[in-house]
Amino acid sequence: MIDESDKSLFRSTVDQQKPIDKDGVKNTVTSKSGANQLFQKYSFLYEPNISGSEAVIHYKSGLSSKVLKKMKQGNMGPTPSIDLHGHKVEEACQSLSKFIHFHSNERFIHIIHGKGYHSDSGLSIMKSQVVHYLKQHPAVLAFCSCTQEMGGTGAVFVHLKAHV
């Protein structure tokens, strides 16, 4: 039998906890500086323009070729990951914004967007939106399609600016 003091201690501890989203992203956003604010000024892309099998790469000028090579080979070590399968475009952008904000202290992240093989046009809606979104995000220095083991053309590695 559990005594009342143990029940009380357990209840007081559990009551202070908040549930975690399925994608592991905090729902609350608090920021002390403008540099670390949640990015919400993105635009949506409603017409897909990238096929599921197409490799993608984008980087800002001045990025080290060593970093790009490391990304292409998947040699970044463990990276936080988000899977956007099953999300609607708007939900995916919101989740992605929260995910990047939450992991702003990381240098690399992994985004699984899928290849969109079930789309009518043969073009990937989610992949096109993720690429469009990442090009707009101020914290993103580079991204490229993953190695086969990490999702191939259905996922991207993203290099984020160092958190200042």
Can you say where each PLM-predicted feature lies in the sequence?
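Long, charged, low-complexity intrinsically disordered regions
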Residues: M1-F108, I112-V164
